[in-house]
C-alpha cells in the first residue's frame, strides 16, 4: 500500500510518519503531482497557518488537484481547515471539499488555544466504528469547523458545539 503525506511546509508531518511506520507503512512525503495521484491513500497533516498553506498549494498548483483526488484522503488539524470552504484565520478561502467554515474560538471564560482532552459524540461514520461514544481525544487548537451536513463526530469547547470529524465521499478530516 502506497501512502503519500502531502508536503506543504506544515508542522506535525514527522509525527504522522512515525505513526504510519509503527503500523508497518513506509509513507512518502511529497508535493509531486504524479506521486500523489499514484498513491493509494493521502494524508494532509498539519500544524500551521491557513493562508500561507493555501498560498503554497496554489503556487504548486495542488489546490485543484487535491479537490479531484479519488483515493481516500485524510486531513488532520490544519489539513481539516484546508479541506473546508473558508477559514477565519487571515480570512482565507480554502479548498471547499467540505462546505463549512472554520471559525476562531472567542471566549472570556475558557483558554484559547484549547489544549486538552474532550469527548467526541454522535459518531456517524464507518471510519469511526471502532470508537465508542464519549471517547476522549486530545486537542491543541484555536479554530474549529462549524457543524454541517458532513459532520460525523462532534465535541464542544467554550460553549461551542463543533465538528470533531468530517466525511464526504473519499475525504475524511479530524
Model-identified regions with their sequence ranges:
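Conserved Rossmann-like nucleotide-cofactor binding loop
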Residues: 11
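Short hydrophobic segments within beta-strands
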Residues: 6-8
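A glycine-centered loop/beta-turn motif at secondary-structure junctions
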Residues: 148-149, 156-174
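Short acidic low-complexity segments
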Residues: 27-38
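Structural motif
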Residues: 43-45, 173
Amino acid at each position: 500500500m502506497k501512502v503519500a503525506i502531502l508536503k506543504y511546509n506544515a508542522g506535525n508531518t514527522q509525527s504522522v510518519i512515525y505513526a504510519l511506520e509503527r503500523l508497518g507503512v513506509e509513507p512518502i512525503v511529497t508535493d509531486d503531482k504524479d506521486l500523489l495521484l499514484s498513491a493509494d491513500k493521502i494524508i494532509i497533516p498539519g500544524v500551521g497557518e491557513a493562508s500561507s498553506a493555501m498560498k503554497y498549494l496554489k503556487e504548486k498548483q495542488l489546490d485543484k488537484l487535491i479537490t479531484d483526488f479519488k483515493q481516500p484522503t485524510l486531513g488532520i488539524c490544519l489539513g481539516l481547515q484546508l479541506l473546508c470552504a473558508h477559514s477565519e484565520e487571515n480570512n482565507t478561502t480554502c479548498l471547499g471539499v467540505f462546505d463549512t467554515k472554520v471559525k476562531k474560538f472567542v471566549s472570556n471564560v475558557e483558554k484559547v488555544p484549547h489544549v486538552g482532552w474532550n469527548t467526541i459524540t454522535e459518531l456517524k461514520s464507518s471510519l469511526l466504528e471502532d470508537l465508542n461514544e464519549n471517547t476522549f481525544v486530545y486537542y491543541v487548537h484555536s479554530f474549529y469547523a462549524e457543524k454541517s451536513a458532513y459532520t460525523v463526530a462532534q465535541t464542544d469547547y467554550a460553549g461551542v458545539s463543533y465538528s470533531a470529524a468530517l466525511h464526504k465521499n473519499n475525504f475524511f478530516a479530524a
